[in-house]
Amino acid sequence: MALWGGRFTQAADQRFKQFNDSLRFDYRLAEQDIVGSVAWSKALVTVGVLTAEEQAQLEEALNVLLEDVRARPQQILESDAEDIHSWVEGKLIDKVGQLGKKLHTGRSRNDQVATDLKLWCKDTVSELLTANRQLQSALVETAQNNQDAVMPGYTHLQRAQPVTFAHWCLAYVEMLARDESRLQDALKRLDVSPLGCGALAGTAYEIDREQLAGWLGFASATRNSLDSVSDRDHVLELLSAAAIGMVHLSRFAEDLIFFNTGEAGFVELSDRVTSGSSLMPQKKNPDALELIRGKCGRVQGALTGMMMTLKGLPLAYNKDMQEDKEGLFDALDTWLDCLHMAALVLDGIQVKRPRCQEAAQQGYANATELADYLVAKGVPFREAHHIVGEAVVEAIRQGKPLEDLPLDELQKFSHVIGEDVYPILSLQSCLDKRAAKGGVSPQQVAQAIAFAQARLG
């Protein structure tokens, strides 16, 4: 059924109807639409539009419909209703007759859909926060199990300084913690109810909107009706959080894809998250990680698309806003799926400690330690930097690590170098010296793990 029509003398062209209808995607708001309708029916009692008996009849019918939807959601898409609001109202009228036609009194689809979408966002943010914290916990557990796995850290994808696999895991814990914080902040701003704002100018019925907001689980009601029906900041905020979160997951995936290569060989992924080749029998491809990386682009696209949709809209509601849902639904679904998949990748990952350590000992990753040693002996850092660079060139020429150069050769570059340099150049020394807060020393990593465990509970 259409919720409009008296103004029109011709039926809508079928092509326009297909173009205009949104049920194929806003069916996902069915539960929220029904919950909002129950609350609205209670509000109508307070202003005398419905009796308590009528409201009870409507609420009972709506609750039955809610259970029907949960049991068989596909029934919605079997309808030719324009949108989810039309579908719910039509089903309600089927159940209670003319009484169902009283429910929309004082309400517009503009404030109705704004409310539905905010309720859906609140539910989905809760799911995202749970998945985010589960992935953080998986990373912390992986870190705890790999505190002694020394590996090279990289800048410019060149070996730079030794780190541990645990320290690498904890870097992503920090990123995910910021993602969690962004979601919590966004939740605060979207937790205001637009219901009761009507089409744009407010409702003509003296409904207590704060009470109505409380019935729906919102912290408060919105303050301006024009803004309320045209506000989609919460969509942009969640898309932005998703875009940033997916960048983090994409980087996580890229790191592990590299670590999993034959050239690096630092980790081996579980068979449960890899696939083979239809031609090459030996292949074990990191498809789960590649898909996480690949799906990042669609989320960025959803954010950009929504910004472009909203940028030129006058107040208040415009049909353009119907375009807010598909991108949002897809982006948050994608983010949620990728959070779950990233946790699954960590479940069963094998860190190849000998290969990690071998790589950490290559590439002159201890060169900075030699520079710091010279500084401790009174050599200015810039001069020490130059001296070590020359020593590295000589070590490369001889095909040796720095610690294998004899003392007399090292002293050619600086007379202050003594026998005490060799312990300094060990991998363990490289780690131990990074003992300031946030560093890679075993003590700092252990503290970071303990802090994360306490925060995550």
Swiss-Prot record:
Q: Would the keyword DNA-binding turn up in this protein's UniProt record?
A: no
Q: Which GO terms describe its cellular component?
A: cytosol
Record keywords? Amino-acid biosynthesis, Arginine biosynthesis, Cytoplasm, Lyase
- Transmembrane region(s): none
Instruction: Please give the coiled-coil regions recorded for this protein.
Output: none
Entry-linked InterPro entries? Arg_succ_lyase_C, Argininosuccinate_lyase, Fumarase/histidase_N, Fumarate_lyase_CS, Fumarate_lyase_fam, Fumarate_lyase_N, L-Aspartase-like
Q: Which GO terms describe its molecular function?
A: argininosuccinate lyase activity
Named in its record, the pathway it takes part in is:
Amino-acid biosynthesis; L-arginine biosynthesis; L-arginine from L-ornithine and carbamoyl phosphate: step 3/3
State where the protein is found. Cytoplasm
A GO term (biological process) for this protein?
A: arginine biosynthetic process via ornithine
The source's domain of life comes to: Bacteria
Substrates-to-products reaction catalysed: 2-(N(omega)-L-arginino)succinate = fumarate + L-arginine
Its EC number is 4.3.2.1
Family of the protein in this entry: Belongs to the lyase 1 family. Argininosuccinate lyase subfamily.
The name on file for this protein is Argininosuccinate lyase
* Encoding gene, per UniProt annotation: argH
